[in-house]
Amino acid sequence: MENRKHTSLKDLAQALGVSIPTVSRALKDSPEISRELCAKAKALAKEMNYRPNPFAMSLRKNAPRIIGVIVPDIVTHFFASILNGIENMAIANGYFVIITTSHESYEHEKRNIENLVNMRVEGIIACLSQETTDFSHISALKDINMPLILFDRVCLTDQFSSVIADGAQSAQMATQHLLDNGSERVAFIGGANHLDIVKRRKHGYLEALRENRIPIEKELVVCRKIDYEEGKIATETLLSLPQPPDAILAMNDTLAFAAMEAVSYTHLRAHETRR
């Protein structure tokens, strides 16, 4: 018997130069797809003898409802607690959760989104990586009507729903607390300046200084990467200033723990030097 290769949706998509979800919708006359592309897809399917796999279709119909989640990591307490909340809520509402990590990589983030779309998840919840400055892979989800909710590190808030804490107010309150307790030179350690969350928290810090009529000193604001080692380097940079700060506001737990270690180590070295 002749061993014939069955034409797949992937074959049709490659021939048409579109994505697999797009050609699938075109074959179903989706109103989201142009009439011209629908006609082309059907004609090509007939020409290439494409036949839908009834077994695969049956599996899809009976598949559990799935939500895809993308986070920078699963080690940080913040993201671990967020994932716990997402999964608990999803299970309570009959959904299954697929968790992926970007490892703070733009390329990993893009690949995760592509994979989740190809898996036909019903929606995606994501926190952007620190490397992400191009949002074309995010805006493309709008074109295929893929529901997306961004949290913590967000973008394109006019197109997608987002969940964020009031970073500006919390940073302002924390800075004010340090000032009220006698600190006069409060430094700020944050992540990369392009991140919206960093902008908001830095704004709150600066606003507290302005309200207290304290001059803003650029050398007291160190924004690097949200990373433990980078946090230690930032703290050591601040402590090496001719006039070091007497308090440090770190924008998250990772940087705060890094700052505490660096301060402790610096004081230990100073003590050993004096002995």
Regions found by a protein language model. Name each.
Residues N88-D134:
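Central regulatory/effector-binding core of bacterial HTH transcription factors
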Residues E47-N53, E107, S129-Q130, M260:
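Short gly/ser/thr-rich secondary-structure transition/capping motifs
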Residues M1-R4, A15, I20, E47, ...:
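Bacterial carbohydrate/catabolite-sensing allosteric modules
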Residues M1-R65, F257:
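N-terminal helix-turn-helix DNA-binding module of bacterial transcription factors
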Residues E2-S8, K46-N84, A92-Y95, H103-E104, ...:
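N-terminal helix-turn-helix/winged-helix DNA-binding helices
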Residues I82-G85, N112, S136-A140, A259:
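A short acidic, amphipathic alpha-helical/loop segment
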